[in-house]
């Protein structure tokens, strides 16, 4: 399941983040890749310990905590500190799979990568290529979103970033450990939550809405790894 979360930041806010990031010290992205990914990875990244990466990463996490779509879709338990990458001049990242568990360098904490997230930071019209391509049993799914919008998809997915042939692509990427580790279960809970919100807005029958809300929370109680 791929979920688009529009407007995490406004285009103007995203443009300000881009200006701050352009002045940063970028390193070869292969420095943070595993043996398999290193063969297909060609981009630049900010070091995870870079003060600017931490500062903007904290801003992203605060913004996500206020985003109802993200909270409902991800049911986050832990969020890996956001990282940042930059593609230009034909750079790309071939098909790969993210590590199942990632350790946070600043602590002994580990994050299970149930969900992967990419937050697009610059205007898609400002660069050619750079699509995120996620492959599953139904084929390939392409994402190249507006500045400030984010795509959320299962961390188990095979995915790649197409070559950027004009301009540059700046993005933040990170992983989410969910209270509910199974994608199918999260999808069902999201569908139920959306239905509950729509029925609430329509002032639906109170008893039926109460039953559906109870079923949602009982399933969450059954499946949550809290």
Curated annotation (Swiss-Prot):
Q: Which residues take part in binding 2-oxoglutarate?
A: 169
Q: Which Pfam families match?
A: 2OG-FeII_Oxy_3, PKHD_C
Q: PROSITE patterns per the record? A: FE2OG_OXY
TM spans (from-to) = none
Is-annotated flag, keyword Metal-binding? yes
UniProt-listed Enzyme Commission number(s): 1.14.11.-
User: Where along this sequence does the record place binding of Fe cation?
Assistant: 96, 98, 159
The record's annotation in Gene3D superfamilies points to:
q2cbj1_9rhob like domain, Rabenosyn, Rab binding domain
- Name it: PKHD-type hydroxylase Bcep18194_C7101
The enzyme's first-digit EC class, named in words, is oxidoreductase
GO MF term (any one) = 2-oxoglutarate-dependent dioxygenase activity
């Amino acid at each position: 399941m791929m979920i688009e979360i529009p407007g995490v930041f406004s285009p103007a806010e995203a443009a300000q983040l881009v200006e701050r990031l352009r002045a940063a010290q970028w390193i070869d992205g292969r420095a943070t890749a595993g043996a398999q990914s290193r063969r297909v990875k060609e981009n630049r990244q900010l070091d995870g310990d870079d003060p600017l990466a931490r500062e903007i990463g904290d801003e992203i996490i605060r913004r996500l905590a206020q985003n109802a779509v993200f909270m409902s879709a991800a049911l986050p338990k832990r969020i890996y500190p956001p990282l940042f990458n930059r593609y230009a001049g034909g750079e790309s990242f071939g098909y790969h799979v993210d590590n199942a568990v990632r350790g946070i360098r600043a602590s002994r904490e580990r994050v299970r990568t149930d969900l992967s997230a990419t937050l697009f930071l610059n205007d898609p019209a400002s660069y050619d290529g750079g699509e995120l391509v996620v492959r599953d049993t139904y084929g390939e799914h392409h994402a190249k979103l507006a500045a400030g919008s984010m795509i959320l998809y299962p961390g188990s997915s095979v995915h790649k970033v197409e070559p950027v042939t004009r301009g540059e692509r700046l993005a933040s990427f990170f992983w989410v450990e969910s209270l509910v580790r199974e994608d199918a279960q999260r999808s069902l809970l999201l569908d139920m939550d959306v239905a509950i919100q729509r029925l609430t807005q329509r002032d639906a029958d109170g008893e039926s809405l109460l039953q559906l809300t109870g079923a949602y929370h009982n399933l969450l109680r059954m499946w949550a790894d809290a």
